[in-house]
Amino acid sequence: MEFRWNDWNEEHIAEKGVSPFEAELVIRGAVRPYPKRIEDDKWLVWGRGRGGRPLQVIFVLDDDDCVFVIHARPLTQREKRRYRR
């Protein structure tokens, strides 16, 4: 699995305190029911980042099937409760 990073997506997820390493960790470690297809051709994954921190990552697949992360953030308290079930 290859990832494509540029200034835009690295800076965008950094605003939420997520590193490219963590986003990749969440996507690579995805377990059912993730990744989930959401609107258009976007994919959603909930998983654990560095230190077990629960994160949400949204990505698209480029024409050459590289993963391009478009959003990442920590889960909210409500989402964390749902994720633990």
Language-model segment annotations:
Residues M1-R85:
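Ribonuclease/tRNase effector modules and their secretory precursors
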